[in-house]
Amino acid sequence: QVEGDIDWPRRFDLMQHHSGEHIVSGIAHARYGCENVGFHMGSDVITIDLSVELTQEQVRELEEAANRYIWEDHPIQIAFPSPQELEVLTYRSKKALTGRVRIVSFPGADTCACCGTHVSSSGQVGLVKLLSCQKFRSGVRIELVCGKRALDHLSRVWEQNHQISNLLSAKAGETAGAVARLLEENQTLKGRLAALEDTRFAALAEQYRDAGDLLLFEEGLSPDSLRRLAAAVLETCGGRCACFSGQDGSGYRY
């Protein structure tokens, strides 16, 4: 005798994602004429390959429509139509089917031939979050998470944003602007540093005027600084110049 137990948290997670994928694919099909041409359920995210390129605005609309459908808590219907009923039924299917066909319906969102497990109503999906949309072949590949995975993702993003908010003394909703200002300040400082280096490099170039071939070692220079130093010295030394920075333990840049 063999007894088995369902790992319910894992099963429910997979059901949430499977049903969420149907809702997103069905709405994308109805709104934008997309065919679902690929689907992979991973341990972190699931991916959907759609046959039509979507704009970022369309992706936002798709996410909003899918969540609205979830929150309306529609019952999910499963049926085995007769061959006569199938002939007049419009449903999604990736291949021609024979024999008994199982139809899973999300009223108002999707009707699809499917043999997988699903939640009993759209509300049990909880939440769907589209994480990315990248061009893939002639269409797009969308990464998404549903249910608890979506909540966990948003919690991680919130925690990261909260830490950035504290580090930059910015409000949680204004961290992007604070980071942009920090990057701008960094670029300004880099420009000032480069100007100071160029003054020093010009003095070194004068020091090595007509010195011929040179091999120079300078501490703490970046690859860009080394290139600018070499260019300055080459104009005055009358020979070839190689510039290095670093040390034996960590290696050298040149």
Task: Describe these PLM feature segments.
Residues 22-24, 48, 116, 142, ...:
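Divalent metal-coordination and catalytic microenvironments
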Residues 1:
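Conserved nucleotide-binding/hydrolysis modules and their immediate coupling elements
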Residues 5, 23-30:
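Well-ordered mid-protein domain cores that form the structural environment of catalytic cofactors
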Residues 125, 131-254:
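Terminal appendage regions of diverse proteins
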Residues 17-21, 25, 59, 63, ...:
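Generic alpha-helical secondary structure
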Residues 6, 50-52, 217-219:
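Short glycine-centered, acidic/aromatic-flanked micro-motifs in structured strand/loop junctions
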Residues 10, 29-136:
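Functional cores that coordinate and move charged inorganic groups
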Residues 8-18:
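Short pre-active-site segment immediately N-terminal to the catalytic Zn-binding motif
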